[in-house]
Amino acid sequence: MEIFGNVVSGLGEGRFFVGLTPYKNKFEELTGFIPFEGTLNVKLKHNFNLDNFNPIEFDGFEINGKRYFGGKVLLIKLFNKHGNFVNCAIVAPKKTDHSKKTLEIIAPIQLRKFLSLNNSNVVKIVI
């Protein structure tokens, strides 16, 4: 399946959460890559239901009495307008401030830099 969306700025929280060792280790286990510390946010025209694609669920954890929630991961390919792509994953935390129209994507590299992406650029996601 192919879906299209626009690159948008995030809240800056992806860098913090992806950088936490338990998340980083879990993402490596589930995706096969060590994620770059940050996410690429992609806004869709319609709500996206990750559960329609059999995502992999992961549990939360606790650090120094603070609870961090689990979520779901779905492996994808992300393409820029030139057809260049990166194997990555959609991450859907159980607790998020994003709408169901915004996807958070992790990858082993900085996607904006590697795929020359700026806000409003259209990307293709292949599931």
UniProtKB/Swiss-Prot annotation:
Belongs to the archaeal riboflavin kinase family. CDP binds at residues 10-15, 109-112. The keyword Metal-binding applies. This is Riboflavin kinase. Pathway: Cofactor biosynthesis; FMN biosynthesis; FMN from riboflavin (CTP route): step 1/1. It comes from the Archaea. Transmembrane segments: none annotated. Keywords: Flavoprotein, FMN, Kinase, Magnesium, Metal-binding, Nucleotide-binding, Transferase. It comes from Methanococcus maripaludis (strain C5 / ATCC BAA-1333). Its cofactor is Mg(2+). GO terms for biological process: FMN biosynthetic process; riboflavin biosynthetic process. Its EC number is 2.7.1.161. FMN binds at residues 96, 104. The keyword Lipoprotein does not apply. It catalyses: riboflavin + CTP = CDP + FMN + H(+). It is an enzyme of class 2 (transferase). Mg(2+) binds at residues 39, 41. HAMAP family: Riboflavin_kinase. InterPro entries: Archaeal_Riboflavin_Kinase, RibK_CTP-dep, Riboflavin_kinase_archaeal, Riboflavin_kinase_CTP-dep, Riboflavin_kinase_dom_sf. One of its GO terms (molecular function) is riboflavin kinase activity. Catalyzes the CTP-dependent phosphorylation of riboflavin (vitamin B2) to form flavin mononucleotide (FMN). Binds 1 Mg(2+) ion per subunit.
